[in-house]
Amino acid sequence: MKLKLKFLLISLLGSSLLLSACSSAATQVISSLSSAQKYFESSQGELNKKNVIKILKEGYESDANKAVHALLAGWKYTLMDQQLLSKEVDSRFIKAFGSGRDKGDVTPSVSEKGLYLNETYTGFSSQIAKVLGVQSQTVKQFNYKWSSNSDFKVQIQISMKGKVGSDSESQQLIKSFLSSDNNGSNQNGGVKETDFNGDSANFDGFFTFTYTPPTQSRKFGATSFDPLTTKINFPADLQIDVSTTHQKLNTLMEANEQVKQIKSRKFTGKTFDLLPFFYYALL
């Protein structure tokens, strides 16, 4: 398949990840994203997900660190350099992430799924997402360090612009959060519904997603490259920390028992599919 490259990624990767002289074609491919692009451009293989997984797996078995660095570079490039979360869903997105998917399915994202709201607010997670009223989101930072599958850290910061109570359903939820308890006392730090009227409903939020080695036995390895499910499974524990520029929201995150749960949460035993990000970078 003859492909026209839309971008070059050499500048993305440090010199330690650039193409090195070695006998294995697979290792050469995964040495950098740009070399993977060149591999498919030269018609050495059809660009499809199974072939990408096959090549990356062979590369991992030859040089694990370079393969993982290429995967993480693809994740970073697609999220931060391409600003995937700021774009409309198009044919390129669908090819990489699948039909029926949207930006809420991207890892990470400020969305009901991306924030795992159902695990914290079971039964009303969709309303919580509406309370946040996400208007836009931008990846501001993406830093990673990888030494081994038991020693790594990926940290991604997303800034978002939101509007508290952007619809009637979320306004009702806010009202229930701010209502007095059975004893007639208010435990919201003095925050009232009127604190979110008009322009006061607008705020900037900052969500930091930190991925660290899984505390369970599963770790990233050759079996993580799965051509049957067309996934590259990346096991990790995840911590999500939230802050905002809205003084009253920050007060609620300290004082209100429901709202404070979103401020800092940790999830164990999660698995994240990194293939769509690498594949998106190649399209």
UniProtKB/Swiss-Prot annotation:
Q: Name one Pfam family in it.
A: Lipoprotein_3
Keyword presence, Transport: no
The lipid modification S-diacylglycerol cysteine is placed on: C22
Residues of the signal sequence? Answer: 1-21
Could you tell me which InterPro entries the record lists for this protein?
A: Lipoprotein_3
Alphabetically list the UniProt keywords.
Cell membrane, Lipoprotein, Membrane, Palmitate, Signal
| This protein's record includes keyword Cell membrane | yes
GO cellular component terms, alphabetically, are: plasma membrane
Where a lipid (N-palmitoyl cysteine) is covalently attached, the residues are: C22
**Highest rank taxon of the organism:** Bacteria
Give the UniProt subcellular location, in the record's own words: Cell membrane
Q: How does it sit in the membrane?
A: Lipid-anchor
UniProt family annotation: Belongs to the MG439/MG440 family.
Q: What's the name of the protein? A: Uncharacterized lipoprotein MG439 homolog 2
Organism from which the protein derives: Mycoplasma pneumoniae (strain ATCC 29342 / M129 / Subtype 1) (Mycoplasmoides pneumoniae)
